[in-house]
Amino acid sequence: MKKIFLLAFLLLSTLSANSKKAGEFTVLQWNIWQEGTSVPGGYDAIINEIVRLKPDFVTFSEVRNYNKSNFSARVLSSLREKGLAYYSFYSYDTGLLSKHPITDSLTVFPENGDHGSIYRLLATVNGHKVAVYTAHLDYLDCAYYNVRGYDGSTWKEIPKPQTVEEVLKVNTDSQRDDAIKLFIDQAHKDMANGYSIILGGDFNEPSHRDWLETNKDMYDHNGMVIPWTVTTLLEEAGFIDSYREIYPDPLTHPGFTYPSDNLLIAPEKLTWAPKADERERIDFIFYQGKGLQAEKAIIFGPKSSIVRSQRVKETTKDKFLLPKGVWPTDHKGLLVTFRFTE
């Protein structure tokens, strides 16, 4: 009788573990720096890391389709040669990869004048409808550089702003808030149709959760506590910052994704503010959906960053998934594991 009970218990435990695994999927946000062309061997490194990590979804930033090519199709072909089947569609500036068949795709914010873009796919993951968005938001009027004494459009040295209002005025001169408002509108439509939402992207703007009273005198924040626009809009609309949900303290887990160190590139080519500490968490994965939960999050890339034109190893409690070979970009990526709990 005891043996039967033990066998039943083990069987139930196994089924429970398997059901948890069945509900899990991973999302990789990755700015690939001009399709990896800025780093020798960069494209092959992108493919090799996807083969290693096998994420369910990849949200790319800086897709360029050089010489009238189709980057997404090229990636699918390269992965197929290595025995992996992924799905995608033509896009520019941002891109999407999916392990799961894509049932629909949409341009939410088309690229125009290099002010960023947002695309969306629909897919089903283990019976759950998922809408995955990729965003590369406007890099101009990049106001966190103004705080550090650099113009956020020309990157020339300027006097530092004295008020938060000055900073936010520059910030909203960009098209980042316009793009994210369109995302929110479309995402609400998708949710009304039963979809859970994932948004991965390089926002080119920090989080209001990272510029607090506790760190206002760190990282060249210039004593400022700033309610950055894009993440505030997302949070007000019910979207959850996966990294900050898991690691709520920016002192212990700042989660910097830019500028990443890259040993194949000289430090002066990795910085836009050579005299400043410009480290920021600008690559995000936000989400919202019934029964959807972020389980794990890890920074993907080198453990060192660029600070005042120097390579500096991070000493925070952030967890890193180090690259196996060539690092193809000047950003760090973000890999998040999600699970459906119902």
Located regions from the model:
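Structured beta-strand-rich core segments of catalytic domains in phosphoester-bond hydrolases
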Residues: 39, 63-151, 296-300
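A solvent-exposed, charged loop/short amphipathic helix patch at secondary-structure junctions
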Residues: 145-173, 214-216
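Residue-level detector of structured alpha->beta connecting loops
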Residues: 54, 99-101, 238
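Metal-dependent phosphoester-hydrolase catalytic domains
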Residues: 122, 188-198, 204-342
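Active-site beta-strand/loop signature of hydrolases that rely on acidic residues for catalysis
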Residues: 25-32, 46-69, 132-135, 166-214, ...
